[in-house]
Amino acid sequence: MIEKRRYFHENPEMTGKEYKTIEYLSAELTALGIEHVVIENGGILATIKGGKDGRAVLLRADVDGLPVQETPDNLKPGMRTCISKNPGVMHACGHDGHMAMLLGAAKILLDKKDEIAGTVYLCFERGEEASGNVEYIFPYIEKNNIQIDTVYGTHLLATAPSGYLAINDGGMMAGAMGFNITIEGAGGHGSRPDQANSPIDCCFVAIYQRLQALRLTKVDPFKTCTYSVGVLQSGNQGNVIPQTLTFGGTMRTFDRDGVGVTFYNELKKAVDGICAAYDCKATYNSYGMPGYAVVNDEEMAQWARKVLAEELGSENVGQWEPWMASESYNQYLQQWPGVFAFLGIQNEEKGIGAAHHNQEFDIDEDVLYKGAAAAATYAIEYLKDDSVKGGRKMTYKQYLEKVANYKLLTKHYGE
């Protein structure tokens, strides 16, 4: 697994461009004798059929890298075991480890194939960082009548101690909403702002002030909500009043239907109203409804902790504070009962502990076997125990209707 992880880490590919990564994964699965299909734009879905008939489990890993220039060292000089060979692209979130662990789980499952009472699907998902490519996987599953009873996924976590597996009774990762908006006023000479209509001076300043006030005036103080502006672009010369200003950011919450929808409505109302007041025009380049948080099924989480504690030791399995980052895996848990797990990688002696998406990010390779063992154990034990819940909660079409993502609904179902 360590060898595989190092290959993935040295050869990261950006979201939506993971062509060589998919080729490599396909070759590895072929070498193992595992049947699989490459889903165009979606990733890979592999199938391991057990020695007995039964239910089905889907195990998932994401595969894409990030536009980050990796530093030669992690938090401790000389401790990196490998580094990206692709300038400006890095596995800075642990997806290299996720792939390696799922391949490791595949080998464990093959070794125990005769005792598997059902089917295990391995899903290697492209484009998780943009949450876009998974939209090709679910329609494939439905159109091919693939029956799944439960899902399991793992994310390496830099804030948890190395080797600690966390499965919460509920929230694991927040839901997200992204926004990117252009404000158009009227440009002019920097010496005569009275003859121009700067999108900066009044319009954006007022929008930003309103944005800061939303948390105080519209968000329940007992609900989690965080947001920030990460993009602000306008003008390129000091004596020219620009015509346009573009700003963008993100909002995160565990209360999508309450806080999330409120934020969506209130920010748009503020932008529209303030632009009208200052005679500016707003263009919503990106403004989608917020996604759902990654929330474990409580019954499944308690069952999973029990069986995985027997495999890994009770001292190594428990719960951990939720993470405000977001994950496309929420879409799996909306459709099927299951769990999402954190596997800690923090190791001060090895210089490992930098935040995800940071240029000094690194993972503790010595924990990969635990992630593989946990995934394989979840699948094997679930298929042994018919008393544990399973089955589809909703179709993908129903999920899209639930999140009001009509663009994707039309794309895949022609409505």
Residue ranges of each PLM-predicted region?
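Divalent metal-coordination and catalytic microenvironments
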Residues: 8, 29, 46, 59, ...
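Short, flexible, mixed-charge acidic loops at enzyme active sites
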Residues: 68-80, 170-174, 348-355
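Metal-dependent amide/peptide-bond hydrolase catalytic core
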Residues: 202-415
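Histidine/acidic-residue-rich, glycine-tolerant segments that coordinate divalent metal ions
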Residues: 66, 80-90, 96-97, 109-231, ...
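Acidic/His- and Gly-rich active-site-bordering loop/insert found
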Residues: 1-91, 96, 100-117
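Soluble non-cytosolic domains of exported or imported proteins
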Residues: 15-20, 96, 198, 295-298, ...
